[in-house]
Design a protein with these regions (language model features):
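Glycine-rich phosphate-binding loops that contact phosphosugars or nucleotide phosphates
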Residues: 1-98
Length: 101
């Protein structure tokens, strides 16, 4: 179940892997556990967070990346996170396959 997503990280995650999390500002406990588990497995974390995610932010290490939407409306946070994800995918595509946007 989604409340136990950290179990998948513990089972499948390998050192050097990347965990990407999305939170709309509510710092759900399953994501807290997933980040802790990822760090226990020597994984990196990219956290797409909202203004209320101070618990998640505190867990991120110096090697992790936080892309924070400084807003309190969960719908607006999700919308901006989705746009950010599309931009990130476009940049990765350009790095892998070249070309111009």
């Amino acid at each position: 179940s989604i409340s136990e997503v950290f179990k998948q990280v513990r089972t499948l995650g390998q050192p050097g892997d990347l965990l990407i999390i999305f939170s709309n500002g509510t710092s759900p406990s399953n994501l807290v556990q997933a980040i802790q588990t990822a760090h226990d497995r020597s994984m990196f974390v990219i956290g797409f967070t909202g203004a209320g995610d101070t618990d998640l932010s505190a867990l991120l290490s110096g090697e992790d990346i936080e892309i924070r939407v400084d807003h309190h409306d969960p719908h607006r946070i999700s919308e901006i996170q989705l746009l950010s994800l599309f931009c990130l995918c476009e940049l990765i595509d350009q790095q892998l396959f070249g070309g111009t946007p």
